[in-house]
Amino acid sequence: MQETLQNYIPEQAIEGVLQLLANENVIVKIKQERKTRHGDYKKLPSGKHQITINSNLNQYRFLITLIHEIAHLKAYKNYGRFIKPHGVEWKRTFQHLMLPYIHPSIFTDDLLPLLANHFKNPKASSDTDIKLALALKQFDAPNGKTYIFEVPLGSRFKMYNGREFKKGGKRVKRYECVEIDTGKVYLFNPNAEVDLLD
């Protein structure tokens, strides 16, 4: 597993991650990109645990996602299966597991304060923390996409699934966008990546 992980996470984090996974009956699978999630955890019928992580994540997002999923495993083992997936038990576990990694030998100086702030009260997805999500995306390979907040008001754009929208105004933190085919209004996070059509 060490050989595999060293291709995906910062070198200084490998030993700690391997210790977290030691003595756990867990399979870690690296998958092709899934648009709706960075990773997931589940207990298999065989009694083993499985963690899957998208292969296209940059090393920092991969590490955060891996620790996020390990926190699900540890919370399940420590508190049972009736806890909320991103409830208090998981949050405390995630904070505790992530703390040793919020270090300048692992993350860049510009990410550290954003991570420290995020982990005061971690959310189900780091993408909902707009500042952290944008800072992490700077380490992604270029993909030619445009962020919603960069799309001019009234312009049309297309999502990864082919659905087309017209950008409307901002409502508190998210943007109202109208689906062209149905006229339905959807809210988009500012850091959603889209293809600009006009």
Predicted feature residues:
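Metalloprotease/metallohydrolase-associated module, dominated by Zn2+-dependent proteases
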Residues: 3-6, 11-44, 50, 56, ...
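Active-site recognition of the HExxH zinc-binding catalytic motif
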Residues: 64-77
